[in-house]
Amino acid sequence: ETITKASRADYRHKKQSGGAGQFGEVHLIIEPYEEGMPKPDTYKFGGQEFKMNVKDTQEIPLEWGGKLVVCNCIVGGAIDARFIPAIVKGLMDRIEQGPLTGSYARDVRVCIYDGKMHPVDSNEISFRLAGRNAFAQAFKEANPKILEPVYDVEVLVPSERMGDVMSDLQGRRAI
C-alpha cells in the first residue's frame, strides 16, 4: 500500500477509568515520499496554511522496501520530545499493517506538527495509540492505492499449449 496525495489528521486518545488515565493528542500531515525530496515547508488544506519548522528527521528503511520518513515539526513544546519515539512506534504499527488491506505500506513522509499532552495522564502508550490512529485516518484520506507485486518470469510451454498459456497470462495482466 502507498498514498498518492498529502493529507492531514488529528487524533486525541483519551481514556479515564479512575486514577491516572491516558491522554495524548497528535496532529500530523502525511504525503507520498520520494528519495531526494526537499524538506517540507508549507502545506495548504481547506484554505488553512500549515508552516513546517523541521527540527529533526528520521529516515526509517522498511524491511519490505521503501521508507518511512518522520519529521518532528513541533514548536513550543506542545508534545514532549520523550513522546516522539512512542508516536513513531504507533506509525510503524500501521505501516506494518497498512490501513487499507493490512498489507505493508511504504514510501510515506509524516510531519508531526502539533498535539497536546496532560501533565499526569500522558504516557507512551497514549501517544503510540494517538500516532497510530492519526496515521490510519490520514492514510485513508490520502488517496491510498494497493501496490501490485511485479515478477520477472520465463515460461516454457509446448507449442500446442501456447494459445492457452498466453490467454491465461494476459488474463493476469502479464506483459
Please provide the spans of the model-predicted regions:
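Accessory interaction regions appended to the cores of large information-processing enzymes
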Residues: 1-175
